């Protein structure tokens, strides 16, 4: 089988290539460059997966394994599909998840179809901690990995169902410690390389700092849910639902961001009780499994949140209304909601709003 391995220069993708080569597959390594070389060189001190050193690491590992290494410069595609979306969502007072969108529109689903055409691959493999398996009940699906601490299925919930047959995630059967041990055993230089922890195009900046450089300061009011004005902010794009720190106001007791009104440039804050709700609206769901087959459904509204049992999902004129069996804290417009039956990823969508 001819397999392309998406390569960032880190230990995960390096071991992915190694495992596939050991299994006897025809392996090529492919690296997507999303940023200009100049930008990456200026910010090489930050732990992001784009620098010239990362590309060099990828090339060294490919040479060590005796496989070809191709580099694609997709700066414009990445900007139009991910960065522009990121900026527009924040302008609307929402909190997007650029990594989930990138997996769908650029480096996983879209890239697999592109490589199928230009390189005649059978599969695209990445270093994601997830599994793609044939499930007796649901068919071909993504499942949670062995290493639950590294579980990346949430970020894959927007990948199109038709792209799953082109993808494979070999690391789903390993823990991170086992992956590093394999790299060490085979003498790969990247065995102890640090993981990339940041949104790559932010280059070490916070979202607020990055967006201020594009949008400038946009001062507006901070209001309590009661209507009382408590202070001013320098841009609603600096805040997300549930945020407490950095508000710069004094109220006598803790208050959190409850809502963001981008039209009036107003930040709404209130006590923690206002963060809880049991319903959300999703305009569209990306189905890995048809809705009528879903059973024992739980939903995860942020990457580090635990899944919460779902009571029902109703199709409405506005989209899909999701009703939880209990109140959920911090439902955030723009974030991804991923749906599961146990370990099986059923699908996902982008939260439109919290519904009272």
UniProtKB/Swiss-Prot annotation:
UniProt superkingdom: Bacteria
Keyword Transferase in record: yes
Class of enzymatic activity (EC top level): transferase
Subcellular location: Cytoplasm
UniProt-annotated site: Interaction with tRNA, residues: 128, 335
Presence of keyword ATP-binding: yes
InterPro entries from the UniProt entry: MnmA-like (IPR004506), MnmA-like_C (IPR046885), MnmA-like_central (IPR046884), MnmA-like_central_sf (IPR023382), Rossmann-like_a/b/a_fold (IPR014729)
Parts of the chain that traverse the membrane: none
Disulphide bridges: 102-200
Reactions it catalyzes: S-sulfanyl-L-cysteinyl-[protein] + uridine(34) in tRNA + AH2 + ATP = 2-thiouridine(34) in tRNA + L-cysteinyl-[protein] + A + AMP + diphosphate + H(+)
Residue positions binding ATP: 6-13, 32, 127
Record-level GO BP terms: tRNA wobble position uridine thiolation
EC number annotated for this UniProt entry: 2.8.1.13
Active-site residues annotated for this sequence: 102 (nucleophile), 200 (cysteine persulfide intermediate)
Region (Interaction with tRNA): 150-152, 302-303
One Gene Ontology cellular component: cytoplasm
GO MF: ATP binding; tRNA binding; tRNA-uridine 2-sulfurtransferase activity
NCBIfam families: PRK00143.1, trmU
PANTHER family noted in UniProt: MITOCHONDRIAL TRNA-SPECIFIC 2-THIOURIDYLASE 1 (PTHR11933:SF5), TRNA 5-METHYLAMINOMETHYL-2-THIOURIDYLATE -METHYLTRANSFERASE (PTHR11933)
Protein's name in the database: tRNA-specific 2-thiouridylase MnmA
Organism: Aquifex aeolicus (strain VF5)
Gene: mnmA
């Amino acid at each position: 089988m001819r397999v392309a391995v998406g390569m960032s220069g880190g230990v995960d993708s390096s071991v992915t290539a190694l495992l596939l080569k050991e299994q006897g597959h025809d392996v090529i390594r492919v690296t997507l460059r999303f940023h200009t070389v100049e930008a990456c060189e200026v910010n090489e001190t930050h732990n992001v997966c784009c620098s010239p050193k990362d590309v060099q690491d990828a090339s060294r590992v490919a040479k060590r394994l005796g496989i070809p290494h191709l580099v694609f410069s997709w700066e414009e595609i990445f900007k139009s599909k991910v960065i522009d979306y990121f900026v527009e969502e924040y302008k609307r007072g929402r909190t997007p998840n650029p990594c989930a969108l990138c997996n769908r529109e650029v480096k996983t689903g879209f890239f697999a179809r592109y490589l199928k055409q230009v390189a005649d691959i059978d599969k695209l493999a990445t270093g994601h901690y997830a599994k793609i398996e044939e499930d007796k009940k649901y068919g071909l699906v993504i499942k949670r990995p062995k290493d639950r601490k590294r579980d990346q299925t949430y970020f894959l919930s927007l990948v199109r169902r038709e792209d799953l047959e082109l993808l494979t995630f070999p690391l789903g059967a390993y823990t991170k410690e086992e992956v590093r041990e394999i790299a060490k055993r085979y003498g790969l230089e990247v065995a102890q390389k640090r993981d990339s922890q940041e949104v790559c195009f932010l280059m070490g900046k916070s979202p607020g700092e990055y967006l201020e450089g594009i949008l400038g300061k946009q001062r507006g009011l901070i209001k309590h849910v009661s209507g009382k004005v408590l202070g001013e902010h320098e841009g609603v794009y600096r805040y997300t639902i549930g945020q407490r720190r950095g508000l710069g106001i004094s109220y006598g007791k803790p208050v959190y961001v409850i809502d963001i009104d981008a039209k009036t440039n107003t930040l709404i804050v209130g006590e923690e009780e206002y963060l809880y709700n049991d319903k959300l609206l999703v305009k569209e769901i990306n189905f890995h499994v048809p809705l009528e087959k879903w059973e024992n459904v739980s939903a995860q509204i942020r990457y580090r949140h635990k899944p919460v049992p779902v009571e029902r999902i109703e199709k409405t004129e506005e989209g899909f209304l999701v009703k939880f069996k209990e109140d959920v804290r911090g439902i955030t417009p723009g974030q991804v909601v991923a749906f599961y039956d146990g370990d099986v990823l059923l699908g996902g969508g982008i939260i439109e709003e919290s519904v009272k």
